[in-house]
């Protein structure tokens, strides 16, 4: 099982954006498999695609993942162009992790509907793939997006639990990403995804990634609780309770997810400190 590092782009009180470049550079040196972001719109997060584009320029090997980006909050043609551009400038290191989103304010602030977000997302995904294939879109007679490095589409991981998500995944995705769950909930989702994958006649097997949080330094613990409770609102207590707070808990988390067939476990930072990445690398024995 690979170990990824989630950048703290949703942490509160980050007053120096260059810290993301420092963490990215060090994470690659330490041997992490990927750098990931999470994101909302109605919250003072650093925007995911911009952070990952900067990280791409500061690195040369490490993978890049949005985990997840709220797809229906974005204009689809622009999102297709942004994702394909990041895929190209990173040399094929980018994976677009997407979810539908469940908080109405993320849609209100963008002027987009909340109740019809699922239907809109279905239409948007089809339009994005047409753009990636180089097809002219309504209003133009020529391609509008760079072609992805694989010639077909930017790799997509889907998050969520709805039945409709499974249909999107087997149509457009390479696998599933779980945010804020447990090894047991991943087992449940793997069974559902695997069944849908086989039913759709897809070849090979879907990829599985999962997100968890950690805070290994005293300075990280001090701000982690406040940041997580603010970001997750009514779910904050549950997320805070699941934070890995020492090396033993990091290793236990790794063993539990590896045992259920997770391909990559992403430990997400709760504080913007290079030292936290170094502590995690030591705890996970990846260096």
Language-model regions, residue ranges each:
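Active-site-adjacent structural elements that line small-molecule/cofactor binding pockets in enzymes
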Residues: 1-287
